């Protein structure tokens, strides 16, 4: 359980960034930060 939580925490943090928002897919595709 601890491994799963540790893996999801950074993902949730990245997806939760206001500067990325719903453009996460395009950001990951282009590999650029919208910030």
Curated annotation (Swiss-Prot):
<keyword id="KW-0800">Toxin</keyword>
<dbReference type="Pfam" id="PF24112">
    <property type="entry name" value="Amanitin"/>
</dbReference>
<feature type="propeptide">
    <location>
        <begin position="19"/>
        <end position="35"/>
    </location>
</feature>
<comment type="similarity">
    <text>Belongs to the MSDIN fungal toxin family.</text>
</comment>
<dbReference type="InterPro" id="IPR027582">
    <property type="entry name" value="Amanitin/phalloidin"/>
</dbReference>
<feature type="cross-link" description="Cyclopeptide (Ile-Pro)">
    <location>
        <begin position="11"/>
        <end position="18"/>
    </location>
</feature>
<comment type="function">
    <text>Cyclic octapeptide that belongs to the MSDIN-like toxin family responsible for a large number of food poisoning cases and deaths. Cycloaminide E is structurally related to other cycloamanides that are non-toxic to mammals but show immunosuppressive activity.</text>
</comment>
<dbReference type="GO" id="GO:0090729">
    <property type="term" value="F:toxin activity"/>
</dbReference>
<protein>
    <recommendedName>
        <fullName>Cycloamanide F proprotein</fullName>
    </recommendedName>
</protein>
<feature type="propeptide">
    <location>
        <begin position="1"/>
        <end position="10"/>
    </location>
</feature>
């Amino acid at each position: 359980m601890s491994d799963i939580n540790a893996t999801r925490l950074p993902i949730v943090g990245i997806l939760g960034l206001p500067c990325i928002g719903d453009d996460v897919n395009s950001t990951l595709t282009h590999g650029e930060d919208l910030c």
